[in-house]
Regions:
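Basic, low-complexity terminal or inter-domain segments flanking catalytic cores
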Residues: 2-5, 28, 93, 99, ...
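Intrinsically disordered, low-complexity regulatory segments
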Residues: 1-178, 265, 383
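OB-fold/S1-family RNA-binding modules
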Residues: 52, 97-102, 143, 242-268
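A conserved hydrophobic secondary-structure block that centers on an alpha-helix together
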Residues: 106, 311, 315-323
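Metal- or metallocofactor-binding catalytic centers and their adjacent structured scaffolds
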Residues: 255-301, 309
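NTP-handling and nucleic-acid-processing catalytic cores
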Residues: 13-22, 40, 188, 194-231, ...
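C-terminal or mid-to-C-terminal helical accessory/interaction module adjacent to the motor/catalytic core
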Residues: 74, 96, 139-234, 286, ...
C-alpha cells in the first residue's frame, strides 16, 4: 500500500494536520514525511493565469486592434516567487509511492481553486483524491474532516465556479482596462498633469467605487430642510414629561401643505400659530388613550465575516482587512471556527454538540460565569429548534463561533485580537439567553381638536444583554424617565385631565446621508439587493452580494492602493478621491453596467449557480463572453473624449486645495 499525502494551503495549517495525525514525521525542505504519510503545503497561490503576451508576444503592446481578447484555451503558469515550493509539491503529488491525495486547502471556492491549479500544472492524473472540508482547526475537527473526506470529484462544480470567477475577472480586467486606458488615459493624464495613467476596472471593484462616489454626490447635492416641531411639557404631580404634537387623520393640519412631515412645519411662523392656538383656553389636556404592552428583543444572529468586520470597524476602528487578519489568526490558533463565512446560523450537526464549545469557555475568565450559567439553564439543549440553527442558510460554513479550545493561545494575543475574540464569544453565548423584555407605554392627549403623543420604554428583564453588552460600545442613556415614574403615569385613566406647563417650538433640520465607513461598506456589499427597486429582480438575486466574504476587504484595499478612494485610519470613513470620481465618470459614460450593483450581484449569483449545479459552466461562459465582447466593442466606438473633461470640471471644485 502506498503513501497518503495531505496538502494544505499554508505551512502553519500543514503543521496542525501533522500534529492531529500524530505523525512521527521528519522535516524536509517544503514538506514533512513519515513512514506512511506526507504533509506538504502551498503558500497561497502557486499558479496564476498568464498575461496576454504569453499567447502572442504582439499582445504585450496595448492596442484596440487586438481587443476583445478572449482565448479559446486559457494559459497558466507557476508564479516565479514560489516556483521552488511548486516544484516540491508537484514532485510529491506525482511520486509513484503516493496513491492517495487529501486536499486540505481552505474549505471554500478560493481554496478549491488553489489546489486545482496545482493539480492541473503538475499533471497529477488519476490518483485517488479526497477533499477534506473542515470548520475549525481543532484536532477533533481535522480528524473528522479526514475521516469523512469525500471524493474530490464531488467538488467539481465548485471548482468550475472558481475557474469561471478567475476567468471573468481576468477578461474584464484585461479588456476593459486596456480599452478604457487606450481611449481615456491621455485625457486624464493631461487633465490631472500626471506622468502616466492606467485605468483599472473590475467586475466588483468598479461597482464598489460607484457606490462610494454616488453616496458622496448625494451628500453634496443634499439641501438641508429646516422643520419646526411643537412639544408640550406635561406635569403630573410635580414631575414632567414631553408630549409631541402630530397631525393625524381628521385633525385640521392633516395632509396640510404647511407640513414637512406629520410632526413638523416648514415655516416657524406656522408652528408659532399652532402654539398660540394650543395655549388658548387653559393649559390642560385630556388623556384619550393609554396603552401598555411588553416588547421582546431576541438576541442577534451570530457573526458572519461581514457583521464582524462592521462591528470591529465601529468598536475598534480597524479596517475589514485587519479584522480578517485577526480572525484568521484566531482560527489558526484554534480559538474560533472558519472565518470566511456568509452564514449567521449553526448547522444541525454542530448544534447537537454545542455544549462542548460552551463548556470550553468556562476556562476563559471573562466568559466563564456566563458559560456556566448557560450550561445550568440547559437552553443549549433546545437551540436546534430556534432560528439560530438552519441548514438551508449554510453554503460552505456555519457562523463564526468560539471552538472552546486553544485557550493556551490567549496569552499571546494582541490587545485588539483579544477584544475581537471577546465580542465573538459574547455574540455566541447571547443566543442561549432569553430575549430582553421592555415595558412600553404610549399615551395620547387631546387639546381642543389637536393631539399630543408621548412614548416611554424601560427594561423589565435584561435577558441576553447580560452577556451581549460589552465594554467597548458607547453606552446609550435610556434614563430620562425612571421606571417608577413611567409606572405612575401608566396608572392614569382615560378621561383624566393633565396640566401643561408650556408649549415650545423645537427646531430641527433634515440630515444628509452618512458617508460609509469600512464596516458599513462591507455590509452594503453583502446586501446588494437594497439598490434594486424591481421587487422580482431583487428576489432573484437574494442571497447574492457584491463580491464574497473572502474578497470584500481586498476590494477596498485595492481601491485605496489605486488611489481611487481614501480610508481614514482613525475613523474608518471612506471617501472617493478626485481621481476616483474621474474614473467613475469615465465608466459611467462608457461601460455603465459595471457600476450597477444588480448586475454585479447577478454575476455572483450565477457563480453560486455554477457551484450548486443549477447553471452549467457553458451557460455562464457564453453570458460572460457576450458581455465582454459587447462592451469592449462599445468602448472602441466611443468618441466623447474631448467632451468628458466638462464632466470632470463639475467635480474639480470639491477638490481645490
Amino acid at each position: 500500500m502506498g503513501k497518503s499525502i495531505y496538502i494544505a494551503e499554508k505551512p502553519s495549517v500543514a503543521r496542525e494536520f501533522a500534529k492531529a495525525l500524530k505523525l512521527n514525521a521528519k522535516n524536509r525542505d517544503g514538506y514533512m514525511e513519515s513512514e506512511n504519510a506526507i504533509v506538504t503545503w502551498c503558500v497561497g497561490h502557486l499558479v496564476t493565469m498568464s498575461y496576454p503576451e504569453e499567447y502572442d508576444p504582439a499582445l504585450k503592446k496595448w492596442s484596440l486592434d487586438t481587443l476583445p481578447f478572449i482565448p479559446d484555451d486559457f494559459k497558466y503558469e507557476v508564479i516565479p516567487q514560489v516556483a521552488k515550493q511548486f516544484q516540491i509539491v508537484s514532485g510529491l503529488l506525482t511520486r509513484e509511492d503516493v496513491d492517495r491525495i487529501y486536499v486540505c486547502t481552505d474549505s471554500g471556492r478560493e481554496g478549491e481553486y488553489i489546489y486545482r491549479l496545482v493539480d492541473q500544472m503538475a499533471k497529477v492524473g488519476n490518483k485517488e483524491k479526497r477533499r477534506v472540508w473542515i470548520d475549525s482547526q481543532t484536532e477533533e475537527e481535522i480528524l473528522r474532516g479526514i475521516r469523512e473526506a469525500k471524493p474530490l470529484s464531488e467538488y467539481d462544480s465548485l471548482s468550475d465556479a472558481a475557474y469561471l470567477r478567475a476567468k471573468e475577472d481576468y477578461l474584464m480586467g484585461i479588456n476593459f482596462s486596456r480599452a478604457l486606458s487606450l481611449k481615456y488615459s491621455y485625457v486624464i493624464r493631461n487633465y490631472l498633469k500626471l506622468d502616466k495613467c492606467v485605468i483599472a476596472v473590475g467586475r466588483v471593484m468598479t461597482c464598489v467605487l460607484g457606490i462610494i462616489v454616488k453616496r458622496e454626490r448625494e451628500i453634496r447635492e443634499f439641501v438641508k430642510t429646516p422643520f419646526y416641531r411643537v412639544v408640550g411639557t406635561v406635569n403630573v404631580a410635580g414631575q414632567t414629561f414631553e408630549a409631541e404634537w402630530k397631525a393625524v387623520k381628521d385633525t385640521p393640519y392633516f395632509n396640510s401643505p404647511l407640513l414637512y412631515k406629520e410632526n413638523g412645519f416648514k415655516q416657524k411662523k406656522d408652528a408659532e400659530d399652532l402654539v398660540k392656538k394650543l395655549s388658548a383656553n387653559g393649559m390642560e389636556a385630556t388623556l384619550v388613550a393609554s396603552e401598555k404592552k411588553k416588547e421582546k428583543k431576541a438576541p442577534p444572529m451570530l457573526y458572519n465575516l461581514a457583521e464582524l468586520q462592521n462591528d470591529c470597524s465601529s468598536l475598534f476602528k480597524i479596517s475589514p482587512s485587519d479584522t480578517l487578519k485577526i480572525v484568521q489568526e484566531l482560527y489558526e490558533k484554534k480559538l474560533v471556527t472558519y472565518p470566511r463565512t456568509d452564514a449567521r446560523v449553526l448547522s444541525t450537526a454542530v448544534a447537537k454538540e454545542i455544549y462542548k464549545n460552551i463548556s470550553g469557555l468556562k476556562r476563559y475568565t471573562p466568559m466563564a460565569a456566563y458559560a456556566d450559567e448557560v450550561l445550568n439553564m440547559g437552553s443549549y439543549k433546545t437551540i436546534a429548534k430556534t432560528k439560530y440553527v438552519n441548514d438551508k442558510q449554510i453554503t460552505d460554513h456555519y457562523a463564526i463561533i468560539p471552538t472552546g479550545q486553544g485557550m493556551g493561545a490567549l496569552r499571546g494575543l494582541s490587545e485588539i485580537a483579544a477584544n475581537v475574540y471577546e465580542i465573538i464569544c459574547r455574540r455566541f453565548l447571547s443566543i442561549f439567553y432569553p430575549a430582553t423584555e421592555y415595558q412600553k407605554l404610549s399615551m395620547t392627549l387631546a387639546k381642543q381638536d389637536e393631539f399630543l403623543f408621548a412614548n416611554f420604554k424601560y427594561m423589565l428583564k435584561e435577558g441576553y444583554l447580560k452577556v451581549a453588552t460589552n465594554r467597548f460600545a458607547r453606552k446609550k442613556d435610556d434614563t430620562k424617565y425612571s421606571p417608577e415614574f413611567i409606572e405612575t403615569i401608566g396608572h392614569l385613566k382615560k378621561g383624566d385631565i393633565l396640566s401643561l406647563d408650556k408649549f415650545e417650538i423645537k427646531e430641527g433640520e433634515t440630515s444628509p446621508p452618512k458617508r460609509y465607513n469600512s464596516g458599513t461598506l462591507i455590509l452594503t456589499m453583502e446586501n446588494a439587493g437594497q439598490f434594486i427597486e424591481d421587487e422580482e429582480l431583487r428576489e432573484q438575486i437574494k442571497g447574492a452580494g457584491i463580491g464574497t466574504s473572502a474578497t470584500r476587504d481586498g476590494i477596498i484595499t485595492k481601491l485605496v492602493n489605486n488611489k481611487y478612494i481614501a480610508l481614514n485610519k482613525k475613523t474608518q470613513i471612506v471617501t472617493p478621491t478626485f481621481l476616483g470620481e474621474i474614473i467613475y465618470d469615465v465608466v459611467y459614460y462608457s461601460i455603465n453596467g459595471l457600476l450597477r450593483a444588480d448586475l454585479t450581484a447577478s454575476w455572483e449569483k450565477g457563480l453560486c449557480g455554477v457551484a450548486d449545479g443549477s447553471i452549467t459552466k457553458e451557460e455562464y461562459t457564453d453570458k460572460m463572453n457576450t458581455f465582454v465582447i459587447k462592451y469592449t466593442n462599445l468602448v472602441k466606438g466611443i468618441s466623447n473624449q474631448n467632451q468628458i473633461t466638462t464632466v470632470f470640471d463639475r467635480t474639480r471644485v470639491y477638490y481645490k486645495k
